[in-house]
Amino acid sequence: MIQTSETAQRYARALFELAQDKGDLATIHKDFRAFAALIKTSADLRKLLDSPAFSRDVKVSALAEIAKKAGYSPLFGKFLGTMATNGRANDILGAEFAFDQFYAKQRGVQRAIVRTAKEMTGAEKSRIESLLARVVGGDVELTSEVDPSLIGGIQLRLGSKLVDASVAKKLERMNTVMKGA
């Protein structure tokens, strides 16, 4: 799970409120998710955002070019430029995570993250999503992640609660018990 700094949350909140005032929340959310996916898949972009070797001006112009070519909304393009100008380009992923949380809350949706050792099928995801919806009494959006180190089983995070029913966790508990015996 992504850790968000207070600064990233403040930028995300400002963008969220501005997009809400302009009636542009869905567009900004779509642009932000697309840009976050780009960051996650491009090592060069991550290096540009994170490295102090690139000047703020270089970051601003590169982000402006990306926003233009990707067809992002002008508001989102300005937001990226502002973060880079203020030396916060490395906080963009954290801001996306915070914005996503604000957007989900505004829509009355709870977010859950499920980790498994191998990719889940669509039916498995749907079943978990519907079970969680019944538990929380509302809509749930499920994000799945693959983590082979779990060996098997499942980890489920809903808000601040974590249920760890992975084989790795069970082995860890057994190891702890055996060391203590």
From Swiss-Prot:
PROSITE patterns: ATPASE_DELTA (PS00389). Pfam families: OSCP. It is found in: Cell inner membrane. One of its GO terms (cellular component) is plasma membrane. InterPro entries: ATP_synth_OSCP/delta_N_sf, ATPase_OSCP/d_CS, ATPase_OSCP/dsu. The keyword Membrane applies. Gene3D superfamilies: N-terminal domain of the delta subunit of the F1F0-ATP synthase (1.10.520.20). Keywords: ATP synthesis, Cell inner membrane, Cell membrane, CF(1), Hydrogen ion transport, Ion transport, Membrane, Transport. One of its GO terms (molecular function) is proton-transporting ATP synthase activity, rotational mechanism. Transmembrane segments: none annotated. It comes from the Bacteria. It is a peripheral membrane protein. Belongs to the ATPase delta chain family. F-type ATPases have 2 components, F(1) - the catalytic core - and F(0) - the membrane proton channel. F(1) has five subunits: alpha(3), beta(3), gamma(1), delta(1), epsilon(1). F(0) has three main subunits: a(1), b(2) and c(10-14). The alpha and beta chains form an alternating ring which encloses part of the gamma chain. F(1) is attached to F(0) by a central stalk formed by the gamma and epsilon chains, while a peripheral stalk is formed by the delta and b chains. F(1)F(0) ATP synthase produces ATP from ADP in the presence of a proton or sodium gradient. F-type ATPases consist of two structural domains, F(1) containing the extramembraneous catalytic core and F(0) containing the membrane proton channel, linked together by a central stalk and a peripheral stalk. During catalysis, ATP synthesis in the catalytic domain of F(1) is coupled via a rotary mechanism of the central stalk subunits to proton translocation. This is ATP synthase subunit delta.
